């Protein structure tokens, strides 16, 4: 039986979601993709995911709002927000563990996702602690 990290990926753009899903699967993740944030939230109520990867700009519910709902259901699940913007207001990132803006290298995204699903790091209280741990991990490999 495989023991792969299960990622919920929510993006309203089917073309983008197919492309990134393919990349993430090549990197060893098991990806469940939803193009509707309402459907994704319903799935979260009955399924546990190791990590949620959310598009920021979606109709019906923003990625930051979906992040808040996911954290309410499963506070220990890391949430990564991706957006076409290089920065977002801090209020939009309140329930987000990492944010990647336009032009982020895919290897940076994948690396951060791998770090966040490590149980020890998922419990760290702030982004500076995660950054320190990521640096230590990179130095040890």
Feature locations, PLM:
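Conserved acidic segment of CheY-like receiver
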Residues: 3-15, 20-24, 52
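Short hydrophobic/Thr-rich beta-strand motif most characteristic of the beta2 strand and flanking loop
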Residues: 28-35, 43
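Acidic catalytic/metal-coordinating carboxylates
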Residues: 35-36, 62-66
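Short amphipathic alpha-helix used as the core "switch/output" element in two-component signaling
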Residues: 42, 64-75
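Active-site residues of response regulator receiver
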Residues: 55
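Receiver (REC) domain active-site loop signature in two-component systems and cognate sites
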Residues: 58
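CheY-like receiver
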Residues: 120-141
């Amino acid at each position: 039986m495989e023991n792969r990290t299960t990622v919920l990926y929510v993006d309203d753009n089917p073309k983008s979601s197919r492309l990134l899903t393919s990349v993430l699967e090549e990197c060893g993740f098991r990806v469940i993709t939803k193009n509707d944030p309402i459907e994704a939230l319903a799935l979260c109520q009955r399924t546990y995911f190791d990590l949620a990867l959310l598009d920021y700009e979606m109709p019906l519910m923003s990625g930051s709002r979906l992040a808040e709902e996911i954290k309410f259901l499963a506070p220990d699940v890391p949430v990564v927000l991706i957006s076409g913007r290089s920065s977002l207001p801090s209020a939009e990132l309140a329930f987000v563990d990492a944010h990647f803006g336009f032009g982020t290298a895919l290897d940076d995204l994948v690396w951060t996702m791998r770090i966040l699903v490590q149980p020890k790091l998922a419990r760290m209280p702030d982004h500076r602690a995660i950054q320190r741990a990521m640096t230590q991990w990179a130095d040890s490999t």
